[in-house]
């Protein structure tokens, strides 16, 4: 994302339009980009930013417009609007008391040729809990999640799983494994493959009725006959999550699940994910840079830096990370 944005800015065009440029950026990268855009605006450039991460955008802009219900309205009070769209979402789930591990990572490392991505990761993912991975862009969070999902194999170390002993510790991932382990990719385009939303959500669902129930939860039933690739990024994200949730996995791996969501949609998504978590007792593992919802998805948090777990904690670690 940084590469594409930098390439666009390097063209020297005087009118710059950016659609969700901060979607997957960590807080420092987002601040650097907005400072650059502010400098360009000061030099006479016209900069238009379409973005949902308003906490990162509003301090740098001159004018704000809200688009909704087919209308474009100018926002006069930026501070008031910021508060209404960025208030942290509360976590209404009971305090998690479990300590039995579902995944036990021991000295896990991963390299690609000469590039070392993860050096020495050791941590336990609690069964039935909600774990959040924090860290800057490029620190290896997505790689770590893919290792847990058995999409990659560690270069060194061991990841023990306690989902079901029949899967063993070295067994290759198969259809039965992914019935238990649901993966939400960072880019929904990578996992949407059916010709309609109905078929996408129903593909692995427990039943057609349950697929419809989940679609209603996520507010996508009206898109039932649409092709998934014809949808907006926010709609694609909701469809991709609904399709995996409809399979009732025991483990839900979410890589930047809130990309493209407005505040109302984000609140609804958190409500649904946590409600299903309470109902099913699933284990959730999330990567996010979204300060609005990180605490609402967290019982346990790990901060990844320089290829190792630099810090671990709970919601207090999430607050420390975003405050810093």
Residue ranges, per PLM feature:
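Catalytic Walker B motif of ABC-type/P-loop ATPase nucleotide-binding domains
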Residues: 16-19, 252-255
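Conserved ABC ATPase "signature" region
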Residues: 208-223
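Conserved ABC ATPase signature
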Residues: 227-231, 235
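ABC ATPase NBD Q-loop/coupling interface
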Residues: 158-176
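The feature captures the beta-strand-to-loop junction immediately N-terminal to the Walker
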Residues: 134-136
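Helix-to-loop junction immediately C-terminal to a conserved catalytic motif
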Residues: 149
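H-loop/switch region of ABC-family ATPase nucleotide-binding domains
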Residues: 51-52, 288-289
């Amino acid at each position: 994302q940084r590469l594409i944005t930098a390439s666009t800015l390097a063209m020297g065009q005087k009118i710059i339009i950016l659609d969700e440029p901060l979607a997957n950026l960590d807080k420092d990268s987002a601040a650097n980009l907005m400072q650059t855009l502010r400098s360009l605006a000061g030099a006479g450039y016209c900069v238009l930013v379409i973005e949902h991460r308003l906490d990162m955008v509003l301090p740098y802009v001159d004018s704000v417009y809200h688009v909704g219900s087919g209308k474009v309205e100018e926002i006069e009070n930026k501070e008031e609007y910021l508060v209404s769209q960025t208030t942290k979402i509360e976590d209404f789930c009971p305090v998690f008391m479990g300590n039995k591990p579902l995944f036990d990572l021991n000295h896990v490392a991963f390299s690609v040729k000469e590039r070392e991505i993860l050096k020495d990761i050791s941590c336990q993912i609690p069964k039935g809990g909600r774990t959040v991975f924090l860290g800057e862009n490029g620190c290896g969070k997505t790689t770590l999640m893919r290792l847990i999902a058995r999409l990659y194999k560690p270069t060194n170390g061991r990841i023990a799983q306690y989902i079901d002993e029949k899967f063993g510790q070295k067994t290759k991932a198969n259809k039965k494994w992914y019935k238990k382990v649901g993966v939400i990719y960072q880019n929904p385009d990578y996992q949407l493959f059916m010709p309609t939303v109905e078929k996408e959500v129903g593909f692995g669902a427990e039943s057609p009725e349950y697929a419809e129930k989940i679609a209603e939860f996520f507010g996508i039933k009206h898109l039932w006959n649409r092709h998934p690739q014809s949808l907006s990024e926010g709609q694609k994200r909701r469809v991709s999550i609904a399709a995996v949730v409809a399979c009732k996995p025991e483990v839900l791996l979410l890589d930047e699940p809130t990309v493209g969501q407005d505040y109302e949609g984000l609140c609804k998504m958190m409500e649904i994910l946590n409600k299903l978590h309470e109902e099913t007792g699933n284990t959730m593992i999330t990567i996010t840079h979204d300060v609005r919802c990180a605490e609402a998805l967290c019982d346990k948090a790990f901060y990844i830096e320089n290829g190792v777990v630099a810090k671990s904690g709970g919601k207090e670690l999430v607050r420390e990370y975003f405050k810093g």
